[in-house]
Amino acid sequence: MSKARVVVGMSGGVDSSVAALLLKQQGYEVIGLFMKNWEDDDTDEYCSSRQDLIDAASVADVIGIPLEAVNFSAEYKERVFSHFLAEYKAGRTPNPDVLCNAEIKFKAFLDHAAGLGADYIATGHYAQVRNTDGVFQLLKGEDGTKDQSYFLYRLNQAQLSRALFPIGHLYKRDVRSIAKDHGLPNFSKKDSTGICFIGERPFREFLNRYLPNDPGEIRTPSGDVMGRHAGLMYYTIGQRQGLGIGGTRGGDGEPWFVSEKDVKRNVLTVVQGHDHPDLLRPALAATDLTWVSGKMPRCNWVYAAKIRYRQSDAPCSITYLDCNKCKIEFAQPQWAVAPGQSVVVYESKVCLGGGVIAATQDD
């Protein structure tokens, strides 16, 4: 019987490298695939893709597997980046990593791998898949500090049935130890952070290349004008840094936080103090719902949800407004709920799916 063929997405980082190594040790026929998803202003100053490809090739050589490089930049721009810009233009705060996983890493990549005769694809995500009576469940990674199921909630049954997450049961320290013990040259390489196509460049500088500035007033809830903002797209709910209005104006010496973005009036509302009531929301409305099993979770049940990556699970309930919109009510008010971000629902360690935060609700 021939070995099952797995195409591994190799980024040049330690996680995907160890994923490829483990699959090779488990007896799979492994092919490495380096994805280039961005070309605009692809300079060494801000983008590490050239070095990442070199690192991936070095690892593939040590493991003894072939490595192919493929360019998905056109697909990325059409399916991910255009949505990213549209959301910022509308005053929301999108999460492109979620869409990149669903549209590029587990769609364009999966299609390409099928053309290579792959039985499965694999990545270095900290997540797990469990087949329960023919239903594929997405589980949290064992390392709670690195769990990436939040970014994978849009994956469907067809995608999960072909997906392997070889390091999902490991802790990060163990991944680095395995890499070092097996002589992988990138065992100590720093983890990548931030949005992949922005790299190390300042976010405001990058966004201004694609969207024009639209300055407006910064106000308090009572209407006092505190200053001017450079454009609502540069701010997100809960933001403290970069407001340009100081930390002591207003009388009580507490720092200022963004509490609301009014796109119609082009007004940025700020409040003083991390625990200001206007920063807390007991409920939210979510749209563009995606459920991993293909079935909507039942109502009248206690679940847990995350409104941002690495947030602690927050107990909640779900009420469906229609088949593509729901209300999520929390047991405790949530801080800085940002429209455009993803809300992801869990039942214990199982990621059920989620949606995009459309609005916050006060009651």
UniProtKB/Swiss-Prot annotation:
The keyword Disulfide bond applies. The active site is at residues 100, 196. Keywords: ATP-binding, Cytoplasm, Disulfide bond, Nucleotide-binding, RNA-binding, Transferase, tRNA processing, tRNA-binding. It catalyses: S-sulfanyl-L-cysteinyl-[protein] + uridine(34) in tRNA + AH2 + ATP = 2-thiouridine(34) in tRNA + L-cysteinyl-[protein] + A + AMP + diphosphate + H(+). Belongs to the MnmA/TRMU family. Residues 95-97 are annotated as: Interaction with target base in tRNA. It is found in: Cytoplasm. It comes from Nitrosospira multiformis (strain ATCC 25196 / NCIMB 11849 / C 71). The record marks 125, 341 as: Interaction with tRNA. It is an enzyme of class 2 (transferase). InterPro entries: MnmA-like (IPR004506), MnmA-like_C (IPR046885), MnmA-like_central (IPR046884), MnmA-like_central_sf (IPR023382), Rossmann-like_a/b/a_fold (IPR014729). Pfam families: tRNA_Me_trans, tRNA_Me_trans_C, tRNA_Me_trans_M. GO terms for biological process: tRNA wobble position uridine thiolation. CDD domains: MnmA_TRMU-like. Disulfide bonds join 100-196. One of its GO terms (molecular function) is ATP binding. Gene3D superfamilies: Adenine nucleotide alpha hydrolases-like domains, HUPs, Translation factors. Its EC number is 2.8.1.13. This is tRNA-specific 2-thiouridylase MnmA. The gene is mnmA. Catalyzes the 2-thiolation of uridine at the wobble position (U34) of tRNA, leading to the formation of s(2)U34. GO terms for cellular component: cytoplasm. Residues 146-148, 308-309 are annotated as: Interaction with tRNA. It comes from the Bacteria. SUPFAM superfamilies: Adenine nucleotide alpha hydrolases-like. ATP binds at residues 9-16, 35, 124.
